[in-house]
Amino acid sequence: MAIKQLSETLINQIAAGEVIERPASAAKELIENALDAGATRIEIATAGGGKTLLRVTDNGLGMSPADLELAIRRHCTSKLDGSLADIRTLGFRGEALPSIGSVARLSITTRTAEAREGATITITGGRSDPVRPSAAVVGTVVEVRELFFATPARLKFMKSERAETAAISEVVRRMAIAFPKVRFVLSGSDRSALEFPATGDDRLARMAQVLGRDFRDNAIEIDAEREGARLTGFAGVPTFNRGNSLQQYAFVNGRPVQDKLIMSAIRAAYAETVPQGRYPVAVLSLTIDPALVDVNVHPAKSDVRFRDPGLIRGLIIGAIREALMREGDRAATTGAQGLMRAFRPEFHRGDQQRPQEPWTAATSPYRPFSPGGAARGFAETPQAAFSDFAQPSARNAAVPVDSIQAADGQAASFPLGAARAQLHENYIVAQTDDGLVIVDQHAAHERLVFETMRTALHARPVPAQALLIPEIVDLPEEDCDRLVAHAGEFTRLGLAIERFGPAAIAVRETPAMLGEMDAAGLVRQLADELAEWDTADGLAGRLEYLAATMACHGSVRSGRRLRTEEMNALLRRMEATPGSGQCNHGRPTYIELKLADIERLFGRS
């Protein structure tokens, strides 16, 4: 078959297949055009999930009749000046309008501030009519009807109207977060109305509009700079997480992106604080020299490529971790409110029912404290009491619930108070000056062990204890190969292993601070994790995560009875340890109930 030149209409339809995948793609391109035109108000109207109707109205600069005629031609744009190395606009290819016009019925009405009348042009399946004068206000109205009518095969791959409408809503949300100075309105016949009034420079207020007040109440500000790259935004506290990554938003020079490098850096930053299978909530904006980032790597401009990806990854991980450390033990207020609602009874008096007042951030059962700041007298706390956690437990030890020594009265003034009892051999009940604290002993000790190991990692190899008889662990050969390849790194953590035949590993030393532990279970888990890391980020940046795994295996278990001095030692260590308000998996280690809250539970005024 002879080679021949494709028609302009067919070329545009091919381009539409890359740029306009679905109605949401068309909405994104049209909203970007409006933003590039300086619009401060953008209204989007849809019908039939955007397939029947998609209209975008803005109050931007508008176009002259001559520019309008050029705008529907392929690769005609006002946003490039001969170089792809300095792109400062959202759009730049000049493909969106001709691509949409080739597969739909497109109408554009526009007017500039200097013009006395507007101009309109229509394109149907790639064929355009002449520009004609029309009545119009300053700005542009782009109306798309019967999207993909010229390529009916594409309609077979469209999702339901509800799904397509949801995709358009997500586009509007992302744009609204990126541009808080712009008012966005989305309306439709299928209850898809959204309205985001402009918030000026208050980015957190816009995020509250889009993500809800819960995010505002549980957000930590991010602001860091490294080698000319600046990262700003907000990230949720670890206990404010979701079951998917849909509420992770990233912007590069104002452009919404879904970049794998950025998303993996967010995961790495929360690796030791968010449970596996859960995802943190974050809105991050990266400002960088346009010459150091390539936005021309994907037709939809949703992916970018950085000249120095290591710099960007390090900046994101470091900035988030520093912010989390700065916030100390802050936990999600929503988790506290849900917990209280779960066991707070309805109050009845005769036929009257008095609803309980909702919890606020100020009355949340989670109370952050400054690590070390309030732990007066920790240096005098008997270290032997806490060191008992690393020793075998006497299951029959008595649970202290009787008298509390006079010294405990002073301990009640500490942030976590004085231990009064142990419930179900797992929860420590402590009394404070104005309420009580319930501590999960396993989660708390797990965090303390991890922090000890992490500190030791940066100073020297973790002290190890030799096993009298090496423990032999049978594993597949490929798992053995991975473990032996990283034996030197395990040694830094106090775990000494060596090959024992083709399909077994001998464990000769374990970390001394963990006492007796399930060495075989630990080795098997490490083998599983290594199998995943070898295809991901590598092991070098995950030593702390290994320390968290070891801490989980070696911390005091649920079901162990503790003496009063052991419980108080644990409380004092928690007060002196940064990040002790949550375990390595992101779960809270304690909750606090104010005396006033307890009285409210019983209907006392």
Swiss-Prot record:
Where does it sit, as one GO cellular component term? Answer: mismatch repair complex
Superkingdom of origin: Bacteria
Sorted keywords for this record are: DNA damage, DNA repair
GO MF annotation list? ATP binding; ATP hydrolysis activity; ATP-dependent DNA damage sensor activity; mismatched DNA binding
Kindly indicate whether the keyword Cytoplasm belongs to this entry: no
What CDD domains does UniProt report for this protein, alphabetically? HATPase_MutL-MLH-PMS-like (cd16926), MutL_Trans (cd00782)
Q: Which Gene3D superfamilies match?
A: 3.30.230.10, Histidine kinase-like ATPase, C-terminal domain, MutL, C-terminal domain, dimerisation subdomain, MutL, C-terminal domain, regulatory subdomain
Q: Which GO terms describe its biological process?
A: mismatch repair
Q: Which family does it belong to?
A: Belongs to the DNA mismatch repair MutL/HexB family.
Described by its record, this protein's role is as follows: This protein is involved in the repair of mismatches in DNA. It is required for dam-dependent methyl-directed DNA mismatch repair. May act as a 'molecular matchmaker', a protein that promotes the formation of a stable complex between two or more DNA-binding proteins in an ATP-dependent manner without itself being part of a final effector complex.
This protein is called: DNA mismatch repair protein MutL
